[in-house]
Swiss-Prot record:
PANTHER family registered for this protein in UniProt: GTP-BINDING PROTEIN 6-RELATED (PTHR10229:SF0), GTP-BINDING PROTEIN HFLX (PTHR10229)
Cofactor(s) needed by this chain: Mg(2+)
Native species: Escherichia coli (strain K12)
Main location: cytoplasm
Quaternary structure note: Monomer. Associates with the 50S ribosomal subunit. This interaction occurs in the presence of GTP, GDP, ATP or ADP, but not in their absence.
The protein's name: GTPase HflX
Residues in coiled coil: none
Gene Ontology BP annotations: rescue of stalled ribosome; response to heat; ribosome disassembly
Domain Hflx-type G: 198-365
Gene3D superfamilies: 6.10.250.2860, GTPase HflX, N-terminal domain, P-loop containing nucleotide triphosphate hydrolases
Family per record: Belongs to the TRAFAC class OBG-HflX-like GTPase superfamily. HflX GTPase family.
Positions of GTP binding: 204-211, 229-233, 251-254, 317-320, 343-345
Length: 426
């Protein structure tokens, strides 16, 4: 088994088309991924197939072509824009006599370079270890010269078992740490939910401009760059929205086509901010030729994390890269804002975004069940004045239980006026 490649290395890239329609944007995105990893592409090899070859993924002739390209260019790694099976990866490494990294391994490497917080690093390591676990097989080149003997009935067998055990132990250890992080996040979320502080979560295809928009809105100076996966760690900031008040804005990891499942699983804690959001701001690069495909790719991941039914406002970003395009709000048949056109880079359209946020969030409804002690008759009267009581019943201890429904703005105003209200929630 070969070590992970280092940034600054030189590679041969392999991209295979499985349809008659050769989509050049797929290849361009792959080249962007490679560039984001800090790897120099010496040669790009393309080809067409109806289905992957079981031994090499590509045909045997193409596999030989790749091996010859490695020798001719002096490349130290071959990068595939596809998911390879452990056996395919191993067969190609033997043929090419260098490391072979598939799309999943490449994305994981970029994530490893980008992670900045302790939590982010743990999440990346977990995904890497899960990926590596499928590739721990009897093929370790540094052990093949060992001779069999007592306790060593095969090349490297004992070492292999030890590594598997260490890998399993480390995975369990990281999962335990991430569960603790998730519990802490959940406590913060629950306190926001009780006070009905809305959470607006930015989602979108990688490099759509989410972090630039986040910075424009909050002036938080989150790391933003024109590269894939510039943001990994979730960042939360409080903002003030007219007629709504305090709102939490969350910036999260960008999505991409064919996002490895291990990655989605490892970033569960980060993506939880998206799953629990009041409103999603789906940021879209309006200047990208694959707008619709990028939207569908994001929707696929949202479905995978059970966030596809959360109310969404589309944000068409980068209008400064379109000709004669002015900021505007598009509305649906109910006259609700459903799309805002803006430029996070120049700030054009930010007032329209805040207007849309006000309209969408102030229209949200708070639903709660409370148990009021006998002495809180005045509070009960307030709910009647607001025409918020849907159901009311007496408890054996003399307290009154209420099921209330009211505009979220009214609920938050009442919480500020009556701080004890939170204690009566059940």
């Amino acid at each position: 088994m070969f070590d992970r490649y280092d940034a600054g290395e030189q590679a041969v890239l392999v991209h295979i088309y499985f349809t008659q329609d050769k989509d050049m944007e797929d290849l361009q995105e792959f080249e962007s991924l490679v560039s984001s990893a800090g790897v120099e592409a010496l040669q790009v090899i393309t080809g067409s197939r109806k289905a992957p070859h079981p031994k090499y993924f590509v045909g045997e002739g193409k596999a030989v072509e790749i091996a010859e390209a490695v020798k001719a260019t002096g490349a130290s790694v071959v990068l595939f824009d596809h998911a390879l099976s452990p056996a395919q990866e191993r067969n190609l490494e033997r043929l090419c006599e260098c490391r072979v990294i598939d799309r999943t391994g490449l994305i994981l490497d970029i994530f490893a370079q980008r992670a900045r917080t302790h939590e982010g690093k743990l999440q990346v390591e977990l995904a890497q270890l899960r990926h590596l676990a499928t590739r721990l097989v009897r093929g370790w080149t540094h052990l093949e010269r060992q001779k069999g003997g007592i306790g060593l009935r095969g090349p490297g067998e004992t070492q292999l078992e030890t590594d598997r055990r260490l890998l399993r132990n480390r995975i369990v250890q990281i999962q335990s740490r991430l569960e603790r992080v998730e519990k802490q996040r959940e406590q913060g979320r629950q306190s926001r939910i009780k006070a009905d502080v809305p959470t607006v979560s930015l989602v979108g295809y990688t490099n759509a401009g989410k972090s630039t928009l986040f910075n424009r809105i909050t002036e938080a100076r989150v790391y933003a760059a024109d590269q894939l996966f510039a943001t990994l760690d979730p960042t939360l900031r409080r903002i003030d929205v007219a007629d709504v008040g305090e709102t939490v804005l969350a910036d999260t990891v960008g999505f991409i086509r064919h996002l490895p499942h291990d990655l989605v699983a490892a970033f569960k804690a980060t993506l939880q901010e998206t799953r629990q959001a009041t409103l999603l701001l789906h940021v879209i690069d309006a200047a990208d030729v694959r707008v619709q495909e990028n939207i569908e790719a994001v929707n696929t991941v949202l479905e995978e994390i059970d966030a596809h039914e959360i109310p969404t406002l589309l944000v068409m970003n980068k209008i400064d890269m379109l000709e004669d395009f002015e900021p505007r709000i598009d509305r649906d048949e109910e006259n609700k804002p459903n799309r805002v056109w803006l430029s996070a880079q120049t700030g054009a359209g930010i007032p329209q975004l805040f207007q849309a946020l006000t309209e969408r969030l102030s229209g949200e409804v708070a639903q709660h069940t409370l148990r009021l002690p006998p002495q809180e008759g005045r509070l009960r009267s307030r709910f009647y004045q607001l025409q918020a009581i849907e159901k009311e019943w007496m408890e054996e201890d003399g307290s009154v239980s209420l099921q209330v429904r009211m505009p979220i703005v009214d609920w938050r105003r009442l919480c500020k006026q009556e701080p004890a209200l939170i204690d009566y929630l059940i």
